[in-house]
């Protein structure tokens, strides 16, 4: 950050800069995608994915102009722009912001269908029923964060991949929260060994220093963007690119992905051992864990404030879930300290 800021921080993306080129090559190599479009915020990257999917639908699939549809999942959170809140299922994100953008349908996320195995998952059936000749993409989170760390049944992404292949539609995964080591893999979709058609990244991509986001896809999808059809003043600027490149390096140099897996398994097991009447379920992957509470016993926000008084930061969602997302470099000693604080607070209720 300091080194690059003394050389060149911002310039038009019309000009070649070494930090930007290096970052694009690095991100392409680790992800397996041919093309990368950089933006600033996660919401911008989601908007970019929507534009890309629609163009692919019109120019590759032959969907009539202005008729493309994208299927999303209930409980989704993809950002706060007017287009994105248009397909939110949470009234607190959209009340008072209409009229809303058309072109989206909502299906059931796996987790809301309460299936015990992928063979009887009603979510896949729900998505299939929403597909028609104008469907260009399915856009989902591999794990839903704002919904309370909802982890789908194993095999769900594989089934979605098969459905998209069969129906000739794009599978776009929003890994703004789950990507870059958070779940114990570089990307959450790697838990099922599939490859999406599009990937959305943000948050950790900036190394907790600067905003930078990206939409990644194939040349077939990206080449539908022509000069003037998309752009960003600050997207991919040399300073953010340099920081993001270093953030990627540190993921591997410091073995943060392996640490996320190992410490996440330890943290999850310890949380599940807490004997408390207020805990309904503990779920998660890697260092991304949700503790769902019995609603009749306590409010999640109250518990978060109690934990804050103990020196531990966490975030509630929907009144019933506490989310834990510790740094990927966290140690067992730090987690033991946290578990002691969590146990203490839980047992006071």
Regions found by a protein language model. Name each.
Residues 1-349:
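Conserved N-terminal phosphate-binding loop of PLP-dependent enzymes in the Aspartate aminotransferase
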